[in-house]
């Protein structure tokens, strides 16, 4: 959980699971971390915040696997590359010689993180993995080919991950062990190139510009601006603006503004101001 930054406050620590609360000016979040096997941890992420100070510094022989169940996650690699995970996406990355941060543009993200520290895997665990034909080195090799590897989770992977949310609490520690081994077995045999998602990288300039556009239209939500007017005002091409906004927030800018207006109207109705 040190990967999540200084906003983490421990709620409850157990021998198998520890729960933590995150809070900063952008919102709140909760995580539940399970020590599954030596060197392997599984974390449930429930985020309702724009960021959680999750800055991951380079680490040797360390692998991270993320599965997005709901919402969106912005993944940053280096200083200039941004891309976005959506529901059903699975990402694999090595922190070998590189760092990245994660944030949540819509302040809504639910997903699972699996971390594997190869230096902590015992000889006994290696024998178990070998017996089950789980080749972690193959997964790690793919993660090192590029900064970030994202695939659209197939039906089997989605089934495994969804079951991690339906198991009864008293069975969860043992059940997670089984499901993690299943997931690693599938990933070790996965044809990454065939399942690779055609995701888009955005530059820091494009991402920062769209953040300003988002804040502007929210601040002036009662006014109407055309795509062309916004693009000209913020000095970005209309095509790049539309593409980046949809990747960041999940819907076109007009749809986002319409939904935002409806949310304001509903809030005013509840408060008796309309």
Regions found by a protein language model. Give the residues of each.
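Alpha-helical bundle regulatory/interaction domains
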Residues: 76, 81-203, 227, 232-234, ...
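Glycine- and acidic-residue-biased ligand/ion/polar-headgroup-sensing regions
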Residues: 40, 51, 59-80, 87-89, ...
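Basic/polar phosphate-binding segments, predominantly the helix-turn-helix DNA-binding elements
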Residues: 185-192, 212, 216-260, 273
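Residue-level recognition of short, well-ordered coil/turn positions
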Residues: 169, 273-274
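Short, basic, alpha-helical segments at the C-terminal edge of helix-turn-helix-like DNA-binding modules
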Residues: 204-205, 257-266
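N-terminal low-complexity or simple alpha-helical regulatory segments
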Residues: 1-59
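Solvent-exposed, amphipathic alpha-helical segments
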Residues: 156-167, 209-220, 264, 268
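Beta-strand secondary-structure signal
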Residues: 44-46, 64-66, 113
């Amino acid at each position: 959980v040190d990967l999540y930054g200084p906003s983490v406050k421990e709620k409850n620590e157990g021998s198998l699971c520890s729960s933590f609360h995150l809070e900063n000016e952008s919102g709140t979040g909760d995580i539940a971390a399970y020590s599954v096997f030596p060197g392997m941890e599984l974390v449930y992420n429930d985020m309702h915040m724009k960021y959680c100070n999750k800055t991951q510094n380079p680490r040797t022989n360390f692998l991270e696997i993320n599965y997005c169940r709901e919402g969106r996650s912005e993944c940053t690699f280096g200083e200039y590359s941004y891309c976005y995970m959506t529901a059903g996406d699975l990402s694999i990355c090595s922190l070998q010689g590189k760092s990245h941060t994660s944030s949540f543009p819509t302040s809504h993200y639910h997903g699972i993180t699996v971390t594997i520290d190869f230096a902590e895997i015992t000889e006994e665990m290696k024998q178990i993995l070998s017996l089950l034909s789980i080749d972690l080195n193959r997964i790690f090799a793919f993660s090192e080919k590029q900064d970030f590897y994202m695939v659209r989770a197939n039906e089997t992977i989605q089934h495994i991950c969804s079951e991690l949310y339906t198991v009864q609490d008293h069975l969860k520690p043992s059940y997670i062990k089984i499901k993690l081994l299943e997931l690693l077995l599938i990933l070790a045999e996965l044809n990454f190139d065939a399942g690779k998602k055609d995701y888009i990288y955005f530059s820091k300039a494009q991402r920062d510009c769209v953040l300003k556009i988002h804040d502007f239209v929210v601040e002036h939500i009662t006014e109407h601006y055309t795509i062309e007017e916004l693009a000209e005002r913020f000095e970005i091409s209309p095509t790049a603006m539309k593409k980046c906004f949809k990747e960041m927030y999940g819907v076109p800018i007009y749809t986002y503004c319409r939904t935002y207006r409806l949310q304001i109207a509903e809030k005013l109705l509840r408060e008796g101001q309309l």
